Protein backbone atom coordinates (compact mmCIF):
# COMPACT_ATOMS: atom_id res chain seq x y z
CA UNK A 1 0.00 0.00 0.00
CA UNK A 2 1.52 3.30 -1.12
CA UNK A 3 1.71 6.20 1.35
CA UNK A 4 1.65 9.92 0.53
CA UNK A 5 2.01 13.17 2.43
CA UNK A 6 -1.13 14.66 0.86
CA UNK A 7 -4.11 13.14 -0.96
CA UNK A 8 -6.21 15.67 -2.89
CA UNK A 9 -9.73 14.67 -3.91
CA UNK A 10 -10.90 16.77 -6.85
CA UNK A 11 -8.95 18.82 -9.39
CA UNK A 12 -11.11 21.83 -10.06
CA UNK A 13 -9.38 25.21 -9.69
CA UNK A 14 -8.80 24.69 -5.94
CA UNK A 15 -7.35 21.17 -6.13
CA UNK A 16 -5.27 21.87 -9.24
CA UNK A 17 -3.79 25.03 -7.72
CA UNK A 18 -2.88 23.25 -4.49
CA UNK A 19 -1.35 20.24 -6.28
CA UNK A 20 0.77 22.56 -8.41
CA UNK A 21 1.97 24.56 -5.40
CA UNK A 22 2.89 21.48 -3.32
CA UNK A 23 4.68 19.66 -6.17
CA UNK A 24 8.30 18.90 -5.32
CA UNK A 25 7.81 19.93 -1.69
CA UNK A 26 5.54 17.11 -0.52
CA UNK A 27 4.60 13.72 -1.91
CA UNK A 28 1.15 14.29 -3.41
CA UNK A 29 -1.51 12.13 -5.04
CA UNK A 30 -4.52 13.76 -6.71
CA UNK A 31 -7.75 12.18 -7.93
CA UNK A 32 -10.11 13.77 -10.46
CA UNK A 33 -13.24 12.57 -12.24
CA UNK A 34 -12.61 14.68 -15.35
CA UNK A 35 -10.67 13.25 -18.28
CA UNK A 36 -7.19 14.58 -18.97
CA UNK A 37 -8.10 15.87 -22.44
CA UNK A 38 -11.14 16.48 -24.63
CA UNK A 39 -14.79 17.05 -23.90
CA UNK A 40 -15.81 13.51 -22.93
CA UNK A 41 -16.79 12.74 -19.36
CA UNK A 42 -17.60 15.21 -16.61
CA UNK A 43 -17.53 18.96 -17.17
CA UNK A 44 -18.59 21.61 -14.67
CA UNK A 45 -21.76 23.54 -15.64
CA UNK A 46 -20.71 27.16 -15.16
CA UNK A 47 -21.24 30.56 -16.74
CA UNK A 48 -17.48 30.79 -17.13
CA UNK A 49 -16.54 34.28 -15.97
CA UNK A 50 -13.22 35.01 -14.27
CA UNK A 51 -13.70 37.65 -11.56
CA UNK A 52 -11.10 40.33 -10.68
CA UNK A 53 -10.10 38.49 -7.47
CA UNK A 54 -9.32 35.36 -9.52
CA UNK A 55 -7.34 37.49 -11.96
CA UNK A 56 -5.29 38.81 -9.02
CA UNK A 57 -4.50 35.23 -8.00
CA UNK A 58 -3.01 34.57 -11.44
CA UNK A 59 -0.99 37.78 -11.23
CA UNK A 60 0.33 36.63 -7.83
CA UNK A 61 1.32 33.25 -9.29
CA UNK A 62 2.83 34.73 -12.46
CA UNK A 63 0.37 32.92 -14.76
CA UNK A 64 -1.23 34.11 -17.98
CA UNK A 65 -4.28 32.58 -19.67
CA UNK A 66 -3.71 30.76 -22.98
CA UNK A 67 -5.85 31.91 -25.89
CA UNK A 68 -7.75 28.60 -26.16
CA UNK A 69 -9.16 29.16 -22.66
CA UNK A 70 -10.49 32.65 -23.42
CA UNK A 71 -13.99 32.85 -24.94
CA UNK A 72 -15.41 35.39 -27.37
CA UNK A 73 -16.65 38.09 -26.85
CA UNK A 74 -15.30 39.99 -23.85
CA UNK A 75 -18.15 41.88 -22.19
CA UNK A 76 -17.68 44.89 -19.91
CA UNK A 77 -21.09 45.22 -18.30
CA UNK A 78 -23.82 43.14 -16.71
CA UNK A 79 -27.44 43.71 -17.71
CA UNK A 80 -29.36 43.39 -14.45
CA UNK A 81 -33.04 42.52 -14.80
CA UNK A 82 -35.74 42.74 -12.14
CA UNK A 83 -38.57 40.76 -13.72
CA UNK A 84 -41.37 41.72 -11.32
CA UNK A 85 -40.51 45.43 -11.44
CA UNK A 86 -39.83 45.37 -15.22
CA UNK A 87 -36.52 47.15 -14.65
CA UNK A 88 -33.26 46.73 -16.55
CA UNK A 89 -29.98 48.39 -15.61
CA UNK A 90 -26.38 48.14 -16.89
CA UNK A 91 -23.49 47.97 -14.44
CA UNK A 92 -19.80 47.90 -15.29
CA UNK A 93 -17.97 44.66 -14.51
CA UNK A 94 -14.43 43.50 -15.27
CA UNK A 95 -14.90 39.77 -15.86
CA UNK A 96 -12.93 37.67 -18.34
CA UNK A 97 -15.16 35.42 -20.45
CA UNK A 98 -13.66 31.90 -20.45
CA UNK A 99 -14.44 28.36 -21.58
CA UNK A 100 -14.82 26.73 -18.17
CA UNK A 101 -14.01 23.16 -19.18
CA UNK A 102 -10.93 24.25 -21.15
CA UNK A 103 -9.93 26.35 -18.15
CA UNK A 104 -10.21 23.38 -15.77
CA UNK A 105 -8.15 21.14 -18.07
CA UNK A 106 -5.53 23.88 -18.45
CA UNK A 107 -5.29 24.21 -14.66
CA UNK A 108 -4.71 20.45 -14.43
CA UNK A 109 -2.06 20.59 -17.16
CA UNK A 110 0.02 22.93 -14.98
CA UNK A 111 0.49 20.25 -12.31
CA UNK A 112 4.11 18.98 -12.47
CA UNK A 113 4.84 15.32 -13.16
CA UNK A 114 6.08 14.81 -9.58
CA UNK A 115 2.42 14.75 -8.49
CA UNK A 116 0.73 11.39 -9.04
CA UNK A 117 -2.50 12.33 -10.86
CA UNK A 118 -5.32 9.93 -11.66
CA UNK A 119 -7.76 11.30 -14.25
CA UNK A 120 -11.23 9.85 -14.89
CA UNK A 121 -11.12 8.32 -11.41
CA UNK A 122 -13.74 7.76 -8.73
CA UNK A 123 -13.11 8.04 -4.99
CA UNK A 124 -15.05 5.17 -3.40
CA UNK A 125 -14.29 5.34 0.32
CA UNK A 126 -12.30 7.35 2.87
CA UNK A 127 -11.63 6.72 6.56
CA UNK A 128 -9.08 7.53 9.26
CA UNK A 129 -7.11 4.80 11.00
CA UNK A 130 -3.78 4.77 12.89
CA UNK A 131 -3.27 8.54 12.34
CA UNK A 132 -3.51 8.07 8.58
CA UNK A 133 -6.20 8.76 6.03
CA UNK A 134 -7.13 5.75 3.91
CA UNK A 135 -8.50 6.29 0.41
CA UNK A 136 -9.98 3.65 -1.88
CA UNK A 137 -10.49 4.79 -5.46
CA UNK A 138 -11.09 3.30 -8.88
CA UNK A 139 -8.91 4.32 -11.82
CA UNK A 140 -7.55 2.68 -14.96
CA UNK A 141 -10.09 -0.12 -14.58
CA UNK A 142 -9.08 -1.32 -11.14
CA UNK A 143 -9.48 -0.42 -7.46
CA UNK A 144 -6.56 0.98 -5.48
CA UNK A 145 -5.94 1.66 -1.80
CA UNK A 146 -3.54 4.35 -0.58
CA UNK A 147 -2.86 6.17 2.68
CA UNK A 148 -1.95 9.79 3.34
CA UNK A 149 -0.93 11.94 6.28
CA UNK A 150 -3.20 14.77 5.11
CA UNK A 151 -6.46 14.59 3.18
CA UNK A 152 -7.77 17.55 1.16
CA UNK A 153 -11.36 17.79 -0.02
CA UNK A 154 -11.46 19.90 -3.17
CA UNK A 155 -14.43 17.98 -4.50
CA UNK A 156 -17.02 20.73 -4.80
CA UNK A 157 -20.64 21.10 -3.74
CA UNK A 158 -21.28 17.37 -3.21
CA UNK A 159 -17.99 16.90 -1.37
CA UNK A 160 -17.49 13.36 -0.13
CA UNK A 161 -14.82 14.61 2.25
CA UNK A 162 -17.12 17.26 3.79
CA UNK A 163 -19.91 14.70 4.25
CA UNK A 164 -17.48 12.33 5.97
CA UNK A 165 -16.11 15.00 8.31
CA UNK A 166 -19.45 16.67 9.05
CA UNK A 167 -22.20 14.06 8.55
CA UNK A 168 -24.81 16.23 10.31
CA UNK A 169 -23.87 19.51 8.65
CA UNK A 170 -26.63 21.02 6.53
CA UNK A 171 -26.02 23.80 4.02
CA UNK A 172 -28.51 25.35 1.65
CA UNK A 173 -28.34 23.88 -1.85
CA UNK A 174 -29.85 24.69 -5.21
CA UNK A 175 -29.91 22.91 -8.53
CA UNK A 176 -28.06 24.95 -11.15
CA UNK A 177 -29.59 24.43 -14.60
CA UNK A 178 -28.09 25.75 -17.84
CA UNK A 179 -29.06 25.47 -21.49
CA UNK A 180 -27.02 26.44 -24.54
CA UNK A 181 -28.61 27.98 -27.64
CA UNK A 182 -27.30 29.25 -30.95
CA UNK A 183 -26.71 32.99 -30.47
CA UNK A 184 -29.45 35.10 -32.05
CA UNK A 185 -28.98 38.43 -30.26
CA UNK A 186 -27.51 41.20 -32.45
CA UNK A 187 -25.30 42.36 -29.56
CA UNK A 188 -23.96 39.68 -27.17
CA UNK A 189 -24.45 40.40 -23.47
CA UNK A 190 -24.12 39.09 -19.94
CA UNK A 191 -27.12 39.32 -17.62
CA UNK A 192 -28.13 38.78 -14.02
CA UNK A 193 -31.85 38.12 -13.50
CA UNK A 194 -33.90 38.44 -10.33
CA UNK A 195 -37.42 37.03 -10.02
CA UNK A 196 -38.49 36.12 -6.49
CA UNK A 197 -41.51 34.25 -7.84
CA UNK A 198 -39.08 31.81 -9.48
CA UNK A 199 -36.13 31.63 -7.05
CA UNK A 200 -34.78 33.43 -4.01
CA UNK A 201 -31.36 33.09 -5.62
CA UNK A 202 -30.83 34.41 -9.16
CA UNK A 203 -30.50 33.47 -12.83
CA UNK A 204 -28.00 34.48 -15.50
CA UNK A 205 -27.11 34.52 -19.17
CA UNK A 206 -23.85 34.87 -21.06
CA UNK A 207 -22.89 35.00 -24.73
CA UNK A 208 -19.97 32.69 -25.47
CA UNK A 209 -18.31 31.60 -28.72
CA UNK A 210 -21.46 31.82 -30.83
CA UNK A 211 -23.74 30.41 -28.15
CA UNK A 212 -26.19 31.99 -25.74
CA UNK A 213 -26.12 30.31 -22.32
CA UNK A 214 -29.11 30.76 -20.04
CA UNK A 215 -29.17 29.34 -16.53
CA UNK A 216 -29.92 29.86 -12.88
CA UNK A 217 -30.02 28.38 -9.39
CA UNK A 218 -33.41 27.01 -8.35
CA UNK A 219 -34.97 25.05 -5.46
CA UNK A 220 -34.01 21.38 -5.66
CA UNK A 221 -37.60 20.09 -5.70
CA UNK A 222 -39.01 21.72 -8.84
CA UNK A 223 -36.05 23.47 -10.40
CA UNK A 224 -36.72 22.36 -13.98
CA UNK A 225 -40.29 23.69 -13.95
CA UNK A 226 -39.16 27.04 -12.54
CA UNK A 227 -36.37 27.27 -15.12
CA UNK A 228 -38.85 26.70 -17.97
CA UNK A 229 -41.27 29.28 -16.55
CA UNK A 230 -38.54 31.92 -16.34
CA UNK A 231 -37.48 31.28 -19.94
CA UNK A 232 -41.05 32.04 -21.03
CA UNK A 233 -41.06 35.28 -19.02
CA UNK A 234 -37.78 36.52 -20.52
CA UNK A 235 -39.25 37.01 -24.00
CA UNK A 236 -40.67 40.28 -22.64
CA UNK A 237 -37.07 41.42 -22.13
CA UNK A 238 -36.01 40.52 -25.72
CA UNK A 239 -34.25 37.28 -24.74
CA UNK A 240 -34.11 34.91 -27.73
CA UNK A 241 -33.77 31.17 -27.27
CA UNK A 242 -34.78 28.73 -30.02
CA UNK A 243 -33.92 25.05 -29.73
CA UNK A 244 -31.53 24.05 -26.95
CA UNK A 245 -28.21 22.66 -28.18
CA UNK A 246 -27.14 21.36 -24.77
CA UNK A 247 -28.58 21.13 -21.25
CA UNK A 248 -26.58 20.88 -18.02
CA UNK A 249 -27.30 20.72 -14.33
CA UNK A 250 -25.43 20.34 -11.05
CA UNK A 251 -25.76 21.09 -7.35
CA UNK A 252 -24.54 24.47 -6.13
CA UNK A 253 -24.03 25.52 -2.52
CA UNK A 254 -25.57 28.71 -1.16
CA UNK A 255 -23.98 29.70 2.17
CA UNK A 256 -26.44 31.63 4.32
CA UNK A 257 -24.75 31.72 7.76
CA UNK A 258 -21.28 31.79 9.31
CA UNK A 259 -21.47 28.09 10.24
CA UNK A 260 -21.75 27.14 6.56
CA UNK A 261 -18.00 27.71 6.14
CA UNK A 262 -16.27 24.52 7.30
CA UNK A 263 -12.50 24.10 7.15
CA UNK A 264 -11.87 20.49 8.19
CA UNK A 265 -10.46 18.55 11.14
CA UNK A 266 -8.23 15.58 12.05
CA UNK A 267 -5.60 16.46 9.41
CA UNK A 268 -8.29 16.72 6.74
CA UNK A 269 -8.89 20.07 5.06
CA UNK A 270 -11.57 21.57 2.83
CA UNK A 271 -10.87 24.14 0.11
CA UNK A 272 -12.99 25.86 -2.52
CA UNK A 273 -16.70 25.11 -2.73
CA UNK A 274 -16.25 21.96 -0.63
CA UNK A 275 -15.61 24.31 2.30
CA UNK A 276 -18.59 26.49 1.40
CA UNK A 277 -16.24 29.10 -0.06
CA UNK A 278 -18.56 30.47 -2.73
CA UNK A 279 -20.13 33.92 -3.04
CA UNK A 280 -23.80 33.98 -2.01
CA UNK A 281 -24.33 37.15 -4.05
CA UNK A 282 -22.94 35.92 -7.38
CA UNK A 283 -22.29 32.15 -6.96
CA UNK A 284 -18.71 32.92 -8.07
CA UNK A 285 -16.28 30.44 -6.58
CA UNK A 286 -13.07 30.36 -8.64
CA UNK A 287 -11.41 33.26 -6.82
CA UNK A 288 -12.12 31.72 -3.40
CA UNK A 289 -10.95 28.33 -4.65
CA UNK A 290 -7.60 29.83 -5.65
CA UNK A 291 -7.27 31.86 -2.45
CA UNK A 292 -8.07 28.93 -0.15
CA UNK A 293 -5.59 26.73 -2.04
CA UNK A 294 -2.87 29.33 -1.46
CA UNK A 295 -3.74 29.60 2.23
CA UNK A 296 -3.62 25.82 2.72
CA UNK A 297 -0.34 25.57 0.80
CA UNK A 298 1.22 28.04 3.23
CA UNK A 299 -0.10 26.18 6.28
CA UNK A 300 1.02 22.73 5.08
CA UNK A 301 4.53 23.91 4.22
CA UNK A 302 5.02 25.86 7.46
CA UNK A 303 3.88 22.86 9.53
CA UNK A 304 2.60 24.67 12.65
CA UNK A 305 1.79 22.63 15.75
CA UNK A 306 -1.96 22.46 15.09
CA UNK A 307 -2.53 22.54 11.34
CA UNK A 308 -6.32 22.54 11.35
CA UNK A 309 -6.44 25.40 13.84
CA UNK A 310 -3.85 27.32 11.81
CA UNK A 311 -5.82 26.84 8.59
CA UNK A 312 -9.05 27.94 10.26
CA UNK A 313 -7.37 31.10 11.54
CA UNK A 314 -5.71 31.79 8.21
CA UNK A 315 -9.04 31.61 6.37
CA UNK A 316 -10.81 33.97 8.77
CA UNK A 317 -10.35 37.00 6.50
CA UNK A 318 -11.65 34.99 3.54
CA UNK A 319 -14.66 33.79 5.52
CA UNK A 320 -15.44 37.33 6.68
CA UNK A 321 -15.38 38.47 3.07
CA UNK A 322 -17.77 35.67 2.12
CA UNK A 323 -20.04 36.51 5.04
CA UNK A 324 -20.24 40.01 3.59
CA UNK A 325 -21.47 38.39 0.36
CA UNK A 326 -24.27 36.75 2.35
CA UNK A 327 -25.36 40.18 3.59
CA UNK A 328 -25.12 41.56 0.05
CA UNK A 329 -27.19 38.65 -1.27
CA UNK A 330 -29.97 39.37 1.21
CA UNK A 331 -30.08 42.95 -0.04
CA UNK A 332 -30.12 41.93 -3.71
CA UNK A 333 -32.86 39.35 -3.24
CA UNK A 334 -35.09 41.66 -1.18
CA UNK A 335 -37.60 42.92 -3.80
CA UNK A 336 -38.31 46.36 -2.30
CA UNK A 337 -34.66 47.21 -1.63
CA UNK A 338 -33.50 45.91 -5.01
CA UNK A 339 -36.21 47.91 -6.78
CA UNK A 340 -35.21 51.08 -4.90
CA UNK A 341 -31.51 50.61 -5.75
CA UNK A 342 -32.20 50.00 -9.44
CA UNK A 343 -34.64 52.91 -9.71
CA UNK A 344 -32.10 55.24 -8.09
CA UNK A 345 -29.83 54.79 -11.11
CA UNK A 346 -26.71 54.57 -8.93
CA UNK A 347 -23.79 53.15 -11.00
CA UNK A 348 -26.13 52.51 -13.94
CA UNK A 349 -24.60 53.20 -17.37
CA UNK A 350 -27.32 54.07 -19.91
CA UNK A 351 -26.79 52.71 -23.41
CA UNK A 352 -26.99 55.07 -26.38
CA UNK A 353 -29.97 54.53 -28.63
CA UNK A 354 -27.83 54.54 -31.77
CA UNK A 355 -25.13 52.10 -30.72
CA UNK A 356 -24.15 49.58 -33.45
CA UNK A 357 -26.50 46.61 -33.61
CA UNK A 358 -23.72 44.30 -34.79
CA UNK A 359 -20.00 44.05 -34.30
CA UNK A 360 -18.44 45.81 -37.28
CA UNK A 361 -14.96 46.89 -38.22
CA UNK A 362 -14.23 50.64 -38.38
CA UNK A 363 -13.79 50.48 -42.18
CA UNK A 364 -17.15 48.82 -42.73
CA UNK A 365 -18.90 52.02 -41.66
CA UNK A 366 -16.86 54.38 -43.90
From Swiss-Prot:
State the disulfide connectivity: none
Residues spanning the membrane: none
MF terms from GO for this chain are: FAD binding
Which SUPFAM superfamilies does the entry mention? FAD/NAD(P)-binding domain
Domain of life of the organism encoding this protein: Bacteria
* Family classification: Belongs to the CbrA family.
PANTHER family assigned to the protein according to its UniProt record, in alphabetical order: CONDITIONED MEDIUM FACTOR RECEPTOR 1, GERANYLGERANYL DIPHOSPHATE REDUCTASE
Record protein name field = Protein CbrA
Q: Which gene encodes it?
A: cbrA
